[in-house]
Curated annotation (Swiss-Prot):
Entry's EC annotation: 3.1.26.11
UniProt keyword annotations, A-Z: Endonuclease, Hydrolase, Metal-binding, Nuclease, tRNA processing, Zinc
GO terms of molecular function: 3'-tRNA processing endoribonuclease activity; zinc ion binding
Catalytic activity: Endonucleolytic cleavage of RNA, removing extra 3' nucleotides from tRNA precursor, generating 3' termini of tRNAs. A 3'-hydroxy group is left at the tRNA terminus and a 5'-phosphoryl group is left at the trailer molecule
Organism: Methanococcus maripaludis (strain C7 / ATCC BAA-1331)
Family: Belongs to the RNase Z family.
Full protein name: Ribonuclease Z
Primary role: Zinc phosphodiesterase, which displays some tRNA 3'-processing endonuclease activity. Probably involved in tRNA maturation, by removing a 3'-trailer from precursor tRNA.
Cofactor comment text: Binds 2 Zn(2+) ions.
Length: 310
């Protein structure tokens, strides 16, 4: 699994930071979290394939998180896309996409599926054989969502147990792999009899724009998340601004990371007021003095971060 930070800025882009967008590459697919203006151009400088983007997850409908969608949709249409594009977001996402398609002379020949998500309670919005995606309602000035991407690992077959029970390669073994019981020599054998617990999978949380929420930290902990991407629009000295605009500071994000039990936190959504990040680094040094085990990164445009399960 690999994260690519296409844009790490906030409401106003800078020379160094584009509007928010994060690519998550897993098992040959690209999952895009937010799609700010200029996202498709940022992609050019990476190994992210636009044609492999099957799912876009929108945290909320502020312009800095969605204005890259029209251009991206048009470009992949020009490249001959035929498979569906799934777009997830809060209430009014469908209206937003409809408005995009009704403005200008778009030629979109592939299906676009829009899924509006309740901002009232956590939901499992995708469930597949090897991953799950969850939404979590957060608090911002408009309906907003956080997301969690969780790798699903299945129990592994223990060949020593298989051989000891005299199970041969064939239909019986396949049924056990598929999760069904079998009968052998008058004895019922269950999948648990021939497997070992799965290794811990990768789990990544993305806060979107939000105030710090202990409930979100608890949700991440429940899902055993290993990495958190959290907005940090302001440094600690601007706590008042963060509260007024319903954003988070560096310290807020780090405290949520600590409460959630993740190993790594990556700070993003950096305000345009910061030409350099010394104020962020100061807050991080203070936090690390008491919590040295937490791995802390400040995201930069085009930064890549690889994740491996245990």
């Amino acid at each position: 699994m690999k994260l690519t930070f296409l844009g790490t800025g906030a409401a106003i882009p800078t020379k160094y930071r584009a509007h928010p967008s994060i690519s998550l590459k897993f098992d040959g697919e690209i999952f895009l979290f937010d799609c700010g203006e200029n996202t498709q151009r940022q992609i050019i400088f990476t190994d992210v394939s636009p044609m492999k983007i099957n799912n876009i997850f929108i945290s909320h409908l502020h312009g800095d998180h969605i204005l890259g969608i029209p251009g991206l949709m048009q470009s992949i249409a020009f490249q001959g896309r035929t498979k569906p594009l799934n777009i997830y977001g809060p209430k009014e996402t469908a209206k937003m996409i409809e408005n995009i398609l009704n403005v200008g002379y778009h030629s979109i020949d592939y299906p676009i599926n829009v899924y509006e998500i309740s901002a009232k309670s956590p939901e499992k919005i995708i469930s597949s054989d090897n991953y799950e995606v969850f939404s979590f309602p957060v608090v911002h000035s408009v309906p907003a969502l956080a997301y969690v991407f969780k790798q699903v690992k299945k129990p592994r077959m223990d060949l020593e147990k298989v051989n000891k029970l005299g199970i041969e390669i064939g239909p019986d073994l396949k049924r056990l792999k598929d999760g069904f019981n079998i009968e052998l020599n008058g004895k019922i054998i269950t999948p648990d009899d021939v497997t070992v617990p799965p290794k811990k999978g990768i789990c990544v949380g993305y806060s979107g724009d939000t105030i710090p929420l202990n409930e979100f930290a608890e949700f991440l902990k429940e899902l055993k998340c290993t990495t958190l991407i959290h907005e940090a629009t302001f440094d600690k000295s601007m706590d008042k601004n963060a509260k007024e605009t319903l954003h988070s500071t560096v310290s807020d994000a780090l405290n949520i990371a600590k409460l959630s039990g993740v190993n790594t936190v990556i700070l993003t959504h950096i305000s345009a007021r910061y030409d350099e990040i010394s104020a962020y680094e100061k807050d991080i040094v203070e936090f690390k003095a008491e919590h040295p085990d937490l791995h802390i990164l400040i995201a930069e445009d085009l930064m890549e971060y690889s994740l491996k399960g245990k």
